Amino acid sequence: MKVVIVTSVASLLDASIQFQKTAYRHHCNYLSMQVVKEIEEFGTINEKNLEFDTWTDVIQNDEIDALVFYRVKQIGISTGVLYKSMMRNRTKPISMYFVRDCLAFDGDPPSFRMTSCNINAYNRNKIKDLIILMNMKTCNKKIIGEFIIDNFGSVDALLSIINSNVTWVTSVINNSNGRGINIRVSNNKMLTITSFRRFVNKLKMYKTTKCASQLDNVCTEMNKMDIIDKK
């Protein structure tokens, strides 16, 4: 399957272009998709975008099987409306995939469906190890923060994996006793979204910790420097 990936940033809260591309690559490799082109946009995507040459070249090329987006909210209009606009210049149906949401928009008539999200054996084991570390009172924030960076690259990358595999991650949290991460599990061990949210919020704290650590390192290096006052 030949696909075109579409990145876009509409606000400071959106994932960076580079982060989106990394997520796309993993998703496309998992679904055996061949990336043949990349489109970068700023702001939400609507029918006006389709008027540009970059888009018309893609839409009119029936060898392109699908467009891959990061999230549904990248599209500023109805997904169905965007699909119909593209199909005016195509003879072959085109699919749309949304990596972050684990959704695809295709079929006849086209509609949303869930897609498989990749969480390989390595990531499964490392997430389990992370939960164990967070349950240990002897592990401080520095140790856990370094574990995240060493095994996932960044907190954002870890959160992307976790948010794409809510059911599995919540089941692992549910099977743990919750000590050290303040997660209460009901007696019948029901999987609750509250447990998942608490876990995610705990992880987000390590983004701040990392920034503070980097600032401390910069300040330490500055203290070592000899400042010469040139007159």
From Swiss-Prot:
Main location: host cell
Cited Pfam families: Pox_F16
Gene Ontology terms: cellular component: host cell nucleolus
Cross-referenced InterPro entries: Poxvirus_F16 (IPR006798)
Induction note: Expressed in the early phase of the viral replicative cycle.
Subcellular location(s) per record: Host nucleus, Host nucleolus
Record keywords: Early protein, Host nucleus
Coiled-coil intervals: none
Family: Belongs to the orthopoxvirus OPG058 family.
Name the record gives this protein: Protein OPG061
Encoding gene, per UniProt annotation: OPG061
